[in-house]
Amino acid sequence: MHKLEKGYRDLYTKNFKNLTELMKKLRGKDGCPWDKEQTHDTLKSCLIEEVYEVVDAVDSGNPENLQEELADLFFLIIFYCQISDDNNIFSLNNVMEACFEKMTRRHPHVFGGKSVENAVAVL
């Protein structure tokens, strides 16, 4: 493994842990009253707004704005997962596992024995 790769992985792990711990604190006993009251349903309008803001950022061609809006959207995904975890429905880890399984299943040309000639053949 390249030294830079390990450092990047360590930083990624640290940042991910910091973000998930932040969300737990916001919804915890001494957390934010607004965050603690949120449900999947009450966050729907925020989710829709953030998706539109990501689309606008893509359209603007401004990478800094896109990064900011993706951060907001990513945080909402963490938020939804924490609400589910708090209610013993599923965890962030369950979502990540499901994502991994789904994407590997959808790409047999990469992770299986299937071969394709071009991008059109993938669809």
Functional labels for PLM-detected ranges:
Residues 1-69, 75-123:
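Flexible "arm" and connector segments at domain edges
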